[in-house]
Amino acid sequence: MSVNYEQVNVAPLVLLSVLDHYKRMNTPDNKRCVGVLLGDNSGSTIKVTNSFALPFEEDEKNPDVWFLDHNYIENMNDMCKKINAKEKMIGWYHSGPKLRSSDLKINGLFKKYTQGNSLLLIVDVKQQGVGLPTDAYMAIEEVKDDGSSTERTFVHLPTAIEAEEAEEIGVEHLLRDVRDQAAGNLSLRLTNQLKSLQGLQRKLRDIVAYLDKVNSGQLPANHIILGKLQDVFNLLPNLGSPDEEAPATKKDDVLASSNTLQKALTVKTNDELMVIYISNLMRAIIAFDNLIENKIKNKKLQEAKRDPEPEEATKEEIQQQESAKA
């Protein structure tokens, strides 16, 4: 069974509310906080626009023991409907940072209040790495390949941070105070690229760890995940050498691919350096041409300042000659 949603868009206000909730109830035990998500799930994209906190208690030793105030949920939901009738209860959140064994049971409880399947949003309030601090999940009935009975499990949904115009203005105002004003555009671009590469490296490590667990039998093979990984591998460029004959050994194949990649990178680098060289050459020629024009203008101005005196003298001589003729 699959879900009918493609993506989950989370408003920045929700992230700020979750962080404020965690900071207010933070204890030495670092217990997780739980709350309700409000928004719209009528389309193919779930929009999470608001949230409110819930009183929640659980036993750390026994994950099956937990407490939620049902009356509080119903009263808060009724009050939120009076403020904005378009926002409805679509799921719940907790501060994670990972899934827990009791999440399926808690999700089943929230399913009674939501129209359709309940959304679980995990917000990592202490994220150390790069990337979005959110993970969205939906509970589905997983059909096993061996024909045994189905069981409920969570399926991951991609998330994105999306804000309205008013929220964007507020977020930009906050980032202006947080951002280092001394840092230039180049340093910011390099920092963003470095963070992107670090996030890519972290994702690749997660993929390798998952495949190792599947290979060792610790996790069952999920054909949907394997199919998506195969699609990613199919998008990779072919670094082999089509001009050469098939190498005799695998080592020779690797060397041929490495040489082809090195050649491609060298050609691309040379092209970029050639563009930079031509651009600098054109800039120097334009500057030299402007310098020549400036020298010519200055010379003409200096000559114009000296020429008026003889011109006036010439006019006086012409007048004297005309008077003499008369």
Curated annotation (Swiss-Prot):
Q: Which organism is it from?
A: Eremothecium gossypii (strain ATCC 10895 / CBS 109.51 / FGSC 9923 / NRRL Y-1056)
InterPro entries registered for this protein in UniProt: EIF3F/CSN6-like_C, JAMM/MPN+_dom, MPN, MPN_RPN7_8
What protein family is recorded? Belongs to the peptidase M67A family.
Chain's role: Acts as a regulatory subunit of the 26S proteasome which is involved in the ATP-dependent degradation of ubiquitinated proteins.
- Region (Disordered) residue spans: 299-326
Give the CC-aspect GO terms: mitotic spindle midzone; proteasome complex; proteasome regulatory particle, lid subcomplex; proteasome storage granule
- SMART domains associated with the record: JAB_MPN
Gene this chain is encoded by: RPN8
Alphabetical keyword list: Proteasome
Q: Which GO terms describe its biological process?
A: proteasome-mediated ubiquitin-dependent protein catabolic process
Question: What is the protein name stated in its UniProt record?
Answer: 26S proteasome regulatory subunit RPN8
